[in-house]
């Protein structure tokens, strides 16, 4: 496997099985540093599983993942992971500011005191995502879009080089959408690498420069032009293709290639 530090994320022959059933089969790709990538594919394609297995949150049956040429444990401080909103316990007694300050733990450690400077930085980040006025609100009292922005703020507090975000754009309003896009574009300009599990094919071309297209196996990894074709989408989505016709036409104006 490539150990070049210019490769932010490299996956080699990764397989995951649940109850003797294949969830991911022989996934292999490399993502260059500075890319802004969408992981796309139908429901059940293994998109979230790919992130979790790569981070060691679930066990892979074979293969491995490297980040910046190293195992995750060696470079975890350089990686920020944002889970699916649905997986979070929103009743947990934690304020928005507390959530953002959790982003310090990767580089400060769990038991080091949070400083006044840390709190000031967290408030600046909350201002950046439009949540400064909600700093002392319990996280479950936020709207869906605000909750996504709060977790994005926690990721920003980590000062990472690679951001892995599971369904970042899920259940957000237009104001949150625009704010999130602005933040991602700023991160891109800073040379950060961004990976988002994404479902709306109509805006992939506008938001991303790289695609990882899955359906339990890797269909395509590379530029949007390479992967967002009728052939590749049909391979991944199969009989769902007709349902995607309108969104793909919005994305490109027309299909590229033919079946």
UniProtKB/Swiss-Prot annotation:
UniProt topology in membrane: Peripheral membrane protein
A GO CC annotation given for this chain: plasma membrane
Subcellular location: Cell inner membrane
Family matches, as InterPro entries: AAA+_ATPase, ABC_transporter-like_ATP-bd, ABC_transporter-like_CS, Metal_Ion_Import_ABC, P-loop_NTPase
SMART domains reported for this sequence: AAA
Superkingdom of origin: Bacteria
Residues that hold ATP according to the record: 41-48
Alphabetical list of CDD domains matching this protein: ABC_Metallic_Cations
Matches recorded under PROSITE patterns: ABC_TRANSPORTER_1 (PS00211), ABC_TRANSPORTER_2 (PS50893)
Gene Ontology MF terms in the entry: ATP binding; ATP hydrolysis activity
Domain ABC transporter positions: 9-241
Keyword field: ATP-binding, Cell inner membrane, Cell membrane, Membrane, Nucleotide-binding, Transport
Family: Belongs to the ABC transporter superfamily.
Function in brief: Part of an ATP-driven transport system TC_0338/TC_0339/TC_0341/TC_0342 for a metal. Probably responsible for energy coupling to the transport system.
Annotated protein name in UniProt: Probable metal transport system ATP-binding protein TC_0339
Organism: Chlamydia muridarum (strain MoPn / Nigg)
